[in-house]
Curated annotation (Swiss-Prot):
SUPFAM superfamilies xrefs: Acid phosphatase/Vanadium-dependent haloperoxidase (SSF48317)
Disulphide linkage map: none
InterPro entries membership: P_Acid_Pase_2/haloperoxi_sf, P_Acid_Pase_2/haloperoxidase, PA_PP_rel
Segments crossing the lipid bilayer: 43-63, 93-113, 124-144, 202-222, 226-246, 254-274
The protein's name: PA-phosphatase related-family protein DDB_G0275547
Species lineage: Eukaryota, Amoebozoa, Evosea, Eumycetozoa, Dictyostelia
Length: 335
């Protein structure tokens, strides 16, 4: 049998497996409409960005405005009696880094090297979705679970006067106090009560984790080429996120479990958001954006429809455009 025929047969079989076509209306998944998505691409993109803005606003409110759930504490608890040290990586330094660094690399790779605006859009959208979802989830955990920072007592700064003016102690031995005995400002105490999970760790893992997936997909790090510098770039993203998280333990802002929880949240969301915008996480097509995937899908679907129409036309003996031998006029055959 001809080898080319076998290759074409295999390719057609692979295409059928890759692109599942739902011919019957009742067999389609919910909200699965080819024509709507094809005709309303800009509306879908606008909706995605609106969701990002909403998530950022809600997450910011949870972080900055909502009072966290209070925790009871004792005045002789050594685990929350650490000194208040200067932050190794303050938030006003972290935010520009986790935004500017991935943005710069994505611009270079997508716009300068690949010159693909759609790939750039999905990379930026995925990064924004990752940060927005992480901010929302981290803020929710901080508000509804919270936790005492290792330097809580020094930040709280209870004095004899504030202890006397606050709520009386509770518990079996009457040794547990609440935040009412703190003499510091409410905003400072609120931050000291929001140790779980680490916000630095989660948003850094979300940003640098997404960036690591992006670089790995574009350059195919483990593609039997042995380029150590590409491996260093990808692993550097993960190491950077790890070091920023560990810095929060070193300056007594978090315990290691707080940091580990933040890492887990950020990495899981980074993986999810990358897959939302690209064809796979670690497959051979993990560099293909969803836009390119749908273009190929639509073309394949349109070709199938055209082929089906041609087949129907070949059996339609009344159709004038049909050029099958069965419906060509006799006078044309006699020419």
């Amino acid at each position: 049998m001809d080898r080319n025929f076998l290759n074409e047969s295999n390719n057609s079989t692979n295409n059928r497996n890759k692109y599942v076509i739902y011919d019957e209306e009742e067999s389609k998944p919910l909200f699965y409409n080819y024509d709507f998505r094809k005709k309303n691409k800009m509306v879908m993109y606008l909706f995605d960005w609106m969701m990002v803005v909403i998530l950022l606003i809600v997450g910011g409110i949870l972080f900055l405005k909502v009072t966290v759930r209070g925790r009871l504490f004792t005045l002789d608890d050594e685990s929350i009696s650490y000194p208040k040290l200067p932050e190794l990586v303050p938030m006003h330094v972290l935010i520009p880094v986790i935004i500017a660094l991935p943005l710069a690399i994505i611009i270079v790779v997508s716009l300068i090297v690949k010159r693909d605006c759609h790939d750039f859009h999905h990379a930026i959208l995925g990064l924004a979705q990752s940060l927005a979802l992480t901010l929302l989830l981290t803020g929710s955990f901080k508000c509804f679970i919270g936790g005492l920072r290792p330097n809580f007592l020094e930040v709280c700064d209870p004095t004899p006067a504030s202890i006397a003016a606050g709520n009386p102690p509770v518990g079996f031995s009457k040794i547990y106090y609440d935040r009412s005995i703190c003499s510091a400002d409410d905003s400072i105490v609120n931050d000291a009560l929001s140790a779980y999970p680490s916000g630095h760790s989660s948003i850094t893992a979300a940003s640098f984790g997404f960036l690591a997936l992006f670089i790995h997909a574009k350059f195919k790090i483990f593609d039997n080429r042995g380029h150590i510098f590409l491996y260093v770039i990808v692993s550097g993203c993960i190491i950077g996120a790890g070091l920023i998280g560990i810095s929060r333990v070193a300056d007594y802002r978090h315990t290691f479990l707080n940091v580990l929880a933040g890492w887990s949240i950020g990495l899981i969301i980074a993986l999810s958001c990358y897959r939302l915008n690209y064809s796979s996480l670690f497959g051979r097509d993990n560099h293909v954006s969803i836009h390119s995937h749908w273009l190929t899908y639509w073309n394949h679907h349109d070709n199938l429809n055209n082929n089906n129409n041609n087949i129907k036309n070949n059996f339609d003996l009344e159709k004038n455009c049909n050029q099958s031998p069965n419906n060509i006029a006799l006078d044309e055959l006699n020419k």
